[in-house]
């Protein structure tokens, strides 16, 4: 992609298990036919958790993963700026079972549309400045908790006890301190989770408008 081509960056934030990944993947799949398979991509904020390979597993488990300090937003900002300039980047790969980055990376080439999704995207003014549209998934916390328990136990090798403990100690408090207040920076607030068809269509139309502007 040349520097003359616009790169539209859309950020989708909200609580853990609020439907961010679902709505991001839905928009991705439905827009590919319009913009081209190789011209739209998704970046997950989780990939930018800081490398903790120098820490013991016991120390890694104690990290507050719902606090902005756990994330390498410096690198994420750098990668978004590079993609906007037409340069490819190496997106880190994060292991939920090892609680650190792996040695693998995924090459992302420049795109016309980049969809970002993550819990703390709207808390960082540098990231907000790079986004052309911002979305907040306003899903009730009790629903998020049920989804999180199911996901983390089935997909991330967690126990129910550890998931509930983390929710009480860090997930909910950090949501109230950082994530919920960041809702004020959203252009679009989406209720009822990632299957909200009207919200999906509105987002797709807005992205199409941004591509034409």
Curated annotation (Swiss-Prot):
GO terms for cellular component: cytoplasm. It is found in: Cytoplasm. ATP binds at residues 14-21. It catalyses: uridine + ATP = UMP + ADP + H(+); cytidine + ATP = CMP + ADP + H(+). InterPro entries: P-loop_NTPase (IPR027417), PRK/URK (IPR006083), Uridine_kinase (IPR026008), Uridine_kinase-like (IPR000764). Its EC number is 2.7.1.48. Keywords: ATP-binding, Cytoplasm, Kinase, Nucleotide-binding, Transferase. The keyword Cytoplasm applies. GO terms for molecular function: ATP binding; cytidine kinase activity; uridine kinase activity. GO terms for biological process: CTP salvage; UMP salvage. Pathway: Pyrimidine metabolism; CTP biosynthesis via salvage pathway; CTP from cytidine: step 1/3; Pyrimidine metabolism; UMP biosynthesis via salvage pathway; UMP from uridine: step 1/1. Belongs to the uridine kinase family. This is Uridine kinase. The lineage of its organism: Bacteria, Pseudomonadati, Pseudomonadota, Gammaproteobacteria, Vibrionales.
């Amino acid at each position: 992609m040349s520097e003359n081509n616009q790169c539209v960056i859309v950020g989708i934030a909200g609580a853990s298990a609020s439907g961010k990944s679902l709505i991001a993947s839905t928009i991705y799949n439905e827009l590919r036919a319009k913009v081209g398979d190789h011209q739209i991509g998704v970046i997950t904020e989780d990939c930018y958790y800081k490398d903790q390979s120098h820490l013991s597993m016991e120390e890694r488990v104690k990290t507050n993963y719902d606090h902005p300090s756990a994330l390498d937003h410096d690198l994420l900002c750098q990668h978004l700026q590079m993609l906007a300039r037409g340069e490819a980047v190496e997106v880190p790969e994060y292991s939920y079972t090892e609680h650190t980055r792996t040695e693998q990376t995924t090459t992302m080439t420049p795109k016309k549309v980049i969809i970002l999704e993550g819990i703390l995207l709207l808390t960082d003014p540098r990231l907000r400045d790079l986004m052309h549209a911002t979305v907040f998934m306003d899903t009730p916390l009790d629903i998020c908790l049920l989804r999180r328990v199911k996901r983390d136990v089935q997909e991330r090798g967690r126990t129910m006890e550890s998931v509930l403990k983390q929710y009480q100690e860090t997930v909910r408090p950090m949501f109230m301190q950082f994530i919920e207040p960041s809702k004020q920076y959203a252009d679009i607030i989406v209720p009822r989770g990632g299957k909200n068809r009207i919200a999906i269509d509105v987002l797709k139309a807005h992205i199409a408008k941004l591509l034409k502007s």
